[in-house]
Amino acid sequence: MKVILLERINKLGRLGDVVEVRPGYGRNFLVPQGKAVVANQRNLEDFAARKAALEQVEAERLLAAQQRAAALADAMVTIALQAGEDGRLFGSVGLHDISAALAALGHEVAHSEIRLAGGPIKRIGEFPVRVHLHPEVELDVMVFVERA
């Protein structure tokens, strides 16, 4: 299935690229999410007419993400939980916990924008957590987990 991308998608293409995707991926994810349209003659003509407006919207989204990244660049989060003597937490620190801690510092970050490489944090220590604000804007935020 050929689709026209309406925004940049990692490992697939940029705005305006005509790419071949699996039918289920296009039909069930890209098209309903508004990330792509089916590549037929009519949609190609419509896209050519709307391309400048779409590029402007994408540039604004990138600028907003860069501004959020600049504000988050020096953010450090401290989360205190009960832990055993060996440093293992009674529970874990997940996406929602980190998102809530960032919100307490005044940074609105959705839990879907946070990437934990090895799953939830289950030990005391400091951990870099990847925050994915835009396909072109990612940064690491340090999370310090300490004993309560």
Swiss-Prot record:
<keyword id="KW-0687">Ribonucleoprotein</keyword>
<protein>
    <recommendedName>
        <fullName>Large ribosomal subunit protein bL9</fullName>
    </recommendedName>
</protein>
<dbReference type="InterPro" id="IPR036935">
    <property type="entry name" value="Ribosomal_bL9_N_sf"/>
</dbReference>
<dbReference type="Pfam" id="PF01281">
    <property type="entry name" value="Ribosomal_L9_N"/>
</dbReference>
<dbReference type="GO" id="GO:0005840">
    <property type="term" value="C:ribosome"/>
</dbReference>
<dbReference type="InterPro" id="IPR000244">
    <property type="entry name" value="Ribosomal_bL9"/>
</dbReference>
<comment type="function">
    <text>Binds to the 23S rRNA.</text>
</comment>
<comment type="similarity">
    <text>Belongs to the bacterial ribosomal protein bL9 family.</text>
</comment>
<keyword id="KW-0699">rRNA-binding</keyword>
<dbReference type="GO" id="GO:1990904">
    <property type="term" value="C:ribonucleoprotein complex"/>
</dbReference>
<keyword id="KW-0694">RNA-binding</keyword>
<dbReference type="GO" id="GO:0019843">
    <property type="term" value="F:rRNA binding"/>
</dbReference>
<dbReference type="GO" id="GO:0006412">
    <property type="term" value="P:translation"/>
</dbReference>
<dbReference type="InterPro" id="IPR020070">
    <property type="entry name" value="Ribosomal_bL9_N"/>
</dbReference>
<dbReference type="GO" id="GO:0003735">
    <property type="term" value="F:structural constituent of ribosome"/>
</dbReference>
<dbReference type="Pfam" id="PF03948">
    <property type="entry name" value="Ribosomal_L9_C"/>
</dbReference>
<dbReference type="InterPro" id="IPR020594">
    <property type="entry name" value="Ribosomal_bL9_bac/chp"/>
</dbReference>
<dbReference type="InterPro" id="IPR020069">
    <property type="entry name" value="Ribosomal_bL9_C"/>
</dbReference>
<dbReference type="InterPro" id="IPR036791">
    <property type="entry name" value="Ribosomal_bL9_C_sf"/>
</dbReference>
<keyword id="KW-0689">Ribosomal protein</keyword>
<dbReference type="InterPro" id="IPR009027">
    <property type="entry name" value="Ribosomal_bL9/RNase_H1_N"/>
</dbReference>
